[in-house]
Amino acid sequence: MIKEITAKYDAEQIEKKVTQFWEDSDAYRKTREHRKSGKRLFFVDGPPYTTGHIHLGTAWNKIIKDSILRYYSMNNRYILERPGWDMHGLPIEVKVEGVLGFKSKKDIESFGVENFIEKCKEFAIKQKQAMTEQFQRLGVWLQWPDPYMTLKDEYIEAAWWTLKQASEKDLLEVGKRSVNWCPRCETAIADSEVEYSERTDPSIYVKFRVKGEENTFIVIWTTTPWTIPANVAVAVHPAYEYSKFRAIRQDGSEEILIAATELIKNVLKQGRYTDFEVLETMLGEELTKLEYESPVGDLVPVQNEIKHGVYLADFVTVENTGCVHIAPGHGMDDFNLGAKHKLPILCPVGSNGSYTEEAGEYAGKNVKEANPIVIEDLKARNRLLAEGTVTHRYGHCWRCKTPIIYLATEQWFLKVTEIKEKMLEEIDAVDWYPDWAGSARFRTWVEGARDWCISRQRYWGIPIPVWKCKKCGKLEVIGTKAELLEKAGLNGDIELHRPYVDRVTVPCECGGEKKRVEDVFDVWFDSAVASWATLKFPQTRDQFDEWWPADFITEGHDQTRGWFYSQLGASMVGFGRAPYKSVLMHGFTLDAGGKKMSKSLGNVISPLDIIGRFGADTLRAYVLSSSAPWDDLKFNLEEVETIHRSINILWNVFRFPLPYMALDNFDPMQVSLDSVRDALREEDRWILSRAQSVVKSVDEAMSGYLLHKAVREILDFTLEDLSRWYIQLIRPRTWTEADDPDKLAAYCVLYEVYVTITKLISPFMPYLAEEMYQNLIRNVDPKAPESVHMCDWPKVNEAYLDTKLEEAMNTARSIVEAASNARQKAGRKLRWPISRIVVSPESEDAARAVERLRSVLMDQTNSKDIVLTGVGKSWDELGLEVIPDPGKIGPVFKRDAGKVVPALQKVDGFALKKAFAEAGEFELTLADGSTVKVTPEMANFKETLPEGTASAESDAGPVYVDANLTPELEAEGYAREVIRRLQDMRKELDLVVDENIQVSVRIEDERVLKLVETLKGLIAEEVRADVFDIGSGVNVSGDLVKDWDVEGIAMKMGIAKK
């Protein structure tokens, strides 16, 4: 049977209880098995790094996923939903280095690669377990015992297989290129891994002396002085105009400079020149005949072996000088220009960011620390035109936050540029939510994509499966572990991580020995193969053929250049199509002011702290309802508290009828809604219709992943329609006899609505839904599904839908609100009855609504009658005051104006308005008996209310409240005041609903006493008093005695338990 619940919503206790129930009943496994015959849905979880505690962003991400997957499950989808874990790469290595106190790769080498690998593995596995428990605490249901983990050999093989496909399709390339490089981690990093932030760097203008011309210089600008020792060329734009001009200083010294014509003034200003003379102008293409000297040739001997020239490039812009310093070893554009013209790829910098011996006098110095040294050397050689600083957005390593540099190194690349057009076609074949996530943001990223550098010079990652012969240099790509064991002639098993796999050699046809190249995969390549790796492909095709590609994925908008992109690229290589059918892109979590959360700002909020304070369901409901999924979430604690209050209201809504239902032994299995259909009131039919409308709205919202609209719809319905309206309407019906059909109808309707709402909230607030389901449904129907999450999603019952009734109730509620506003103006509280409400409807629909819901209106306005005027008609008891306009009267009547104004004020307003309408004028008799004619512009009109009434506007039209009191109304008003206070005292004594009491009331005001005595029986019935003593000299006693001030009348009341 239905049981009472606690008065207070206790999230911690409920969630502990429900978690235990789920574990004891094996609810997740059974729920998934329950849907095995349903339509398949393949979901791929974007794997978080196993680096520690979950944060608000990862919590929001998993809550979005869980809510959508629960919704799909209830719609009979059989879901493959393995959680994923990214367990390799710099994110893990940097954490382990921190634990071990390491500062560089040298420390790792000294420690031992094998030891380091084992530490990384141990760390990743330990953190995975901790994070699993944290996600489970959020109420997230996934196949937690069977996750996919990137460190497993079966997963590694999926990456190997994909690379072999690239090799076979001629999409794999090895070569020297200038790449993003982290000097602390000593590895290449991808474009998508570069994080940009504000940084102040040197800003210098440098003079390169032109060979064969006296005192003539090309002027370049750079923010990286440390790259000057690697300069090999200058780039200019072929179509820009350049000038050779004499620049003169105040002391009379002069130099001949070359720069873009448009930028001469900037160069003069930077160099503090006072005058200039243009000697010659030419297009950029005419400068290519020039050669120049390195400004640091005496310090960097290798510079003297290079022929420095001017080359054309479209990437040059009209900024600073229009001449760009080119160092192919330290920039992608520079490298490409150098490769085009076969320029030397000078890169005198090592992997740790320090100059090599090739840098001459700078050897051994860290490049960033060398900036001021280079500047001083340029100054000493009179090659520094100007120096300053610039604050700009500069790239940093995504994991250790070290400023990146560009280094020309040998790397492995996927030739994305060769499949880019097909990738763009596949983007159009995917359903994107919102649409612009694919059609704009993602498309733009892919259009600008370069070949993907997939190699990293690190340790803890998937080893690149390329074996190279030491003797002949032949390369071989291995696709699986079995293939490697066979070619190596090994029996048994090996682990596919470094350094174990590095020990495996493969014989070469030339008689030499092939060893694995040392690089590991870019960690984004790990997760790129998730959709087939999680299906255990290529070991077996069974699951792959049944499930692939993914039906749905969702991640943050940063993944347009991360996981969305890497998956698409790898899948195009492996299968020639996108690995997903639909993608939901969500936003970032920010603080309330819109700033990124960071420890340095002290604005980080832990989801676990929020759960500890408010519970998981509150956090879930908040992040889901706060904004559209693709908008950034500005986390606001006050809004969390508001949602928590809403859930408390939801709890109280559920709790409200339970004591009465339990007391009456109400059994919804015995009393159906059909059996009480004839006893249904209009408000019952309305709430049934509203519940169906909510189901429809939530379904529509979920079809477009508008989770915020879905959750808001449910909470608004609970708060506005159930709590603030329907429950207020039916409250008196719950106090009647147990077998009263009217009461049973209210019970059945509430039960029906509660069952619907319990199912609707289950994807979003799974703990609360389960708690209510077990009490409301499982307790009365043992044949019902074991968990709410096994239930089918509610379908719209068209038989209950009545949109006309919903519109009518909206009208009625507007009238009630207007009546309440009018009561306040009249100073009459709602507890006090009034004789009538008058409504002047502005439409036939409004009039019909009033007639249809007359009893609801009378009840909710506490009025004895509802009076309707005709549609568009004014209330006939209204007066119409005439307000003369002296400004219009004065010019016409001049001296007589003083007589006209008071005479006009006395005229009947209705008669005057009628005359104006019919004749366009009115003959006014003045005090002296003379008459004048007045016209419409001379008078304004103002409605006046009868004495004791007040009005307010509603959607239906004006509403008037007659607040005049009769003795009968006053008696009822005082009686209601007494009832309210006695009920408060019952609550204070914590009495059960049906417990009878003895009441004593003393009222010394004889007039009020007589009024209250007339309704003694009503008061006794309402407060369940079988003994009720009232009088001016009554001895008030009992278990609780209180003095009250009731509308200025002193009263003493006592309650005694029976």
Swiss-Prot record:
Coiled-coil region: none
Enzyme class: ligase
UniProt motif ('HIGH' region) ranges: 48-58
Keyword field: Aminoacyl-tRNA synthetase, ATP-binding, Cytoplasm, Ligase, Metal-binding, Nucleotide-binding, Protein biosynthesis, Zinc
Protein residues bound to ATP: 599
Subcellular location(s) per record: Cytoplasm
'KMSKS' region, short sequence motif: residues: 596-600
The protein's required cofactors: Zn(2+)
GO molecular function, one term: zinc ion binding
Alphabetical list of InterPro entries matching this protein: aa-tRNA-synth_I_CS, aa-tRNA-synth_Ia, Anticodon_Ile_ABEc, Ile-tRNA-ligase, Ile-tRNA-ligase_type2, M/V/L/I-tRNA-synth_anticd-bd, Rossmann-like_a/b/a_fold, tRNAsynth_Ia_anticodon-bd
Keyword Ligase annotated: yes
Keyword Nucleotide-binding applies: yes
Function, in words: Catalyzes the attachment of isoleucine to tRNA(Ile). As IleRS can inadvertently accommodate and process structurally similar amino acids such as valine, to avoid such errors it has two additional distinct tRNA(Ile)-dependent editing activities. One activity is designated as 'pretransfer' editing and involves the hydrolysis of activated Val-AMP. The other activity is designated 'posttransfer' editing and involves deacylation of mischarged Val-tRNA(Ile).
Record text on subunit structure and interactions: Monomer.
PANTHER family: ISOLEUCINE--TRNA LIGASE, CYTOPLASMIC, SOLEUCYL-TRNA SYNTHETASE
Entry's family note: Belongs to the class-I aminoacyl-tRNA synthetase family. IleS type 2 subfamily.
The record's note on its domains: IleRS has two distinct active sites: one for aminoacylation and one for editing. The misactivated valine is translocated from the active site to the editing site, which sterically excludes the correctly activated isoleucine. The single editing site contains two valyl binding pockets, one specific for each substrate (Val-AMP or Val-tRNA(Ile)).
Full protein name: Isoleucine--tRNA ligase
Name of the encoding gene: ileS
